[in-house]
Amino acid sequence: MSEPLIQLKGIERRYQSGEQEVTVLHPLDLTIEAGEMIAIVGASGSGKSTLMNLLGCLDRPSSGQYLFRGQDTATLDALSLARLRCHHFGFIFQRYHLLPHLNAAANVEIPAVYAGTSRAERQARSQALLTRLGLSDRSHHTPSQLSGGQQQRVSIARALANGGEVILADEPTGALDSQSGKEVMAILKELHAQGHTIILVTHDMEVASHADRIITLKDGRVQEDSGRKPAAVPVTPTAAPAGKEGVGHDWDRYREAARMALHAMLAHRMRTFLTMLGIIIGIAAVVSVVALGQGARAKVIDQINAMGTNTIDIFPGKDWGDEKAASIQTLNKRDLDALLGQPYLEGASPQIAAPGQLRYRNKTSSGSIVGVGNDFFRVKGMKLTNGRLFDERDIQNRAAVAVVDGKTIESLLGKQDPVGQVVLVGTLPVRIIGVVEEETGFGRSSQSVNVWLPYSAVMSRLISQNHFSQLTIRVKDGVQPALAEQAAIELLTQRHGVKDFFTFSSDSIIKSVEKTTATMTLLVSAIAVISLIVGGVGVMNIMLVSVVERTREIGIRIAVGARQSDILQQFLIEAVMVSLLGGMLGVGVSLFIGLLFSLFVESIQMHFSLFSILMAFGCSSLIGILFGYLPARNAARLDPVEALARE
């Protein structure tokens, strides 16, 4: 004798109601053979729905044994029970329980998704089942576009998606007109004839009369069992295509979860947008601040480079503001010669500032009069635009010649060619021999008038001084500025016998600017992070609301074979999608801000980096995971019986 399909031994179900324990099903024994068509009847409150939930593994008995093909279901964990529901049971509900945002074909495919069937196979099976049930022309219609009878046939097709070895039909005709009810019962009888085990749960004796065996329940006890009728050898029902595990299965699950998430987001567009708003603001703020900081940094570094790249300035005294600096006269020609002989330096030039006014004919202007060496313009990276620069002969001869910039020409000479013109620098007449580009680097104004003379001429013919106010050196390419600076300090300290000077390099300015920029970026980013956290809380709140609104959908998915991990994954992916979309919109807003900024502000350009954009997406994804986990976990832990009963 073959083993029974289903055996219930002393099954009992009790619920806690306040402080009292209510027994819904008293100990009962029941055996169901494969291929039977059974009707479980009884009045409301008789326990028939509870028995159906136990048979379909949606609920667990309080005591007793439930054996399916000899396997005690009490020994199965949640994952094994989900597989049992997925591969062996098919549910048909009184209210159809179709997902309203999916069409008929997609509703039928749901169990096959959780079974791991490939997309092509489940689509083909879905279409075949709908055609078999007379709905081939309705496969792309949503439930709202179908009649009650058509919806119930879609429900039957869904129950058969994975083979439907056991079909549990809860009041299958309860919401249908008489004609549709007859059609549904005819389909169930046909399925029974094909070898499916059919279990009807109904209070309608007319519906029950279609079954070969009727079990009557009253007050949680079996009042009557008509007994099994002899039947032909059951035919094995057609099984669903074999499911798969691994990457392909996981990809199908992810894709299905993403599709469901998109449907849920589109169903509540305004709510979804408001949920994203905090994330949009936070991401836009972070990306914009970083871009602005990078733009400001690039601007300052460009200005510093305009002063002369890899340059180090040497000043007398201990530091800026040293009162004794004016009395220190140790920076001299011998120091300059010693520095010029160092292999790590490309050039060196002194600087001596001289007071005085500039006069040309009847025009007078105040400006910067500086004595420099012939290496000065190369050290500073200044380009000649007209004439020539100083040479060593001019330095040796203390020549009364000058190099000027465009601002000096504009202020004194107007539009005439400046080269060859004689201007009065203080009391010394000098001839202009060259023009260089205006100095507009870091700390310099493009409005200043600049005149450069050989330092020897300034020291002997303008002021009586045999020491330099400043030395500027340029480090060779490939040499680390910090090492060159340290070597120069050691050289001059050894020569002077004491360190009576200090250095200031473009590298130190850059580091200071980068530190300041990083601090400001961190400060504003911290404020933006608060906005992101607020946005994350908004995501969590809306996902909690979504779980409540979609409780019945969760129950349906569990009934057709979804595991807890499937439900957790679906809602977690939805939270991540909301956050990611918010991140994308935030980056878009930031790029738009950058475009507007470039139209109205010319001095600084916002520099958007791929790293900051990727970080923005990473942050938004992390927010989705962190703040979406709690709602997703709540969804996965829902009791399927309570979820299905929720209106």
UniProtKB/Swiss-Prot annotation:
What residue spans carry the Low complexity bias annotation?
A: 230-242
Q: Which GO terms describe its cellular component?
A: plasma membrane
Instruction: Name a Pfam family for this protein.
Output: ABC_tran
The answer to keyword Transmembrane helix applying to this record is yes
Localization recorded for this chain is: Cell inner membrane
Similarity comment: Belongs to the ABC transporter superfamily. Macrolide exporter (TC 3.A.1.122) family.
Q: What is this protein called?
A: Macrolide export ATP-binding/permease protein MacB 2
